[in-house]
Amino acid sequence: MAKDTTGRMRVTVKSGGRMKLSSKLWLERQLNDPYVAQAKRDGYRSRAAYKLTEIDDKFRLLKSGMAVVDLGAAPGGWSQVAAKKVGAADGRGKVVAIDLLEMGEVPGVTFAQLDFLDPSAPERLREMLGGGADIVMSDMAANTTGHRKTDQLRIVGLVETAAMFASEVLKPGGTFLAKVFQSGADASLMTELKRDYASVKHVKPAASRKDSSERYLLATGFRGGAARDAEAAAETE
């Protein structure tokens, strides 16, 4: 072991066998990440729980009694945080988690193993929530190819699709929160969202790794379909 720049003991992984360098570096990063260790102590399924916690501590998005949709929810870290914040376990709020992958049960959370791109998904979500959502959130990341420009377009495309889904299930005044990666590719997405929401901004919680271009797009004050269409019509006159 060696100490890092903060004085903490740093774990190093010996190379050997068939372990690739990329795997070695990933394992070292996990072993030395304080958020990974804290997540285990706090019972969270992923370090991502602290990203949502920090964003919510700053912007007060999740409130008791709210209805929340968590897209690409597995393994469930964000759902755990949301359920606690809105009081889902005791029936005050509701959290519906969606993913193509299976996800272990989270107290108070309704899980649906489905593709949110399915045309029937918005209606199914409304049925599970008993109405519209106050917040649609997504910590999803697109599969990467290693080609930077292609990956950026894939990521933005995924967020655009999630935003379209959100526009079908959000209540007026609702919130959309989604992971993006810093690039010029999301400029048009920001423009579109500013038509649909009163406020759109980028936020980067401390739990996001400093060397990562990861950040979150936060859109609040959803105007709703009728208001959005009226504004668009006025712009064309």
Swiss-Prot record:
Entry keywords, A to Z:
Cytoplasm, Methyltransferase, rRNA processing, S-adenosyl-L-methionine, Transferase
| Record GO cellular component, one term | cytoplasm
User: Which residues participate in S-adenosyl-L-methionine binding?
Assistant: G76, W78, D99, D115, D139
The UniProt entry lists the main location of this chain as: cytoplasm
The record's annotation in InterPro entries points to:
RNA_methyltr_RlmE, RNA_MeTrfase_FtsJ_dom, rRNA-MeTfrase_E, SAM-dependent_MTases_sf
* Reactions catalysed, as given in the entry: uridine(2552) in 23S rRNA + S-adenosyl-L-methionine = 2'-O-methyluridine(2552) in 23S rRNA + S-adenosyl-L-homocysteine + H(+)
Establish whether keyword Transferase is in the entry. Answer: yes
Q: Which GO terms describe its molecular function?
A: rRNA (uridine-2'-O-)-methyltransferase activity
Q: What is its EC number?
A: 2.1.1.166
Q: Where in the cell is it found?
A: Cytoplasm
Residues at the catalytic site: K179
* Taxonomy, superkingdom: Bacteria
Q: Per its UniProt entry, what is the enzyme's top EC class, as one word?
A: transferase
Does the record carry rRNA processing as a key word? Answer: yes
Tell me the function of this protein.
Specifically methylates the uridine in position 2552 of 23S rRNA at the 2'-O position of the ribose in the fully assembled 50S ribosomal subunit.
Family affiliation: Belongs to the class I-like SAM-binding methyltransferase superfamily. RNA methyltransferase RlmE family.
Q: Which protein, by its recorded name, is this?
A: Ribosomal RNA large subunit methyltransferase E
Organismal lineage: Bacteria, Pseudomonadati, Pseudomonadota, Alphaproteobacteria, Hyphomicrobiales
- Which gene name belongs to this protein? rlmE
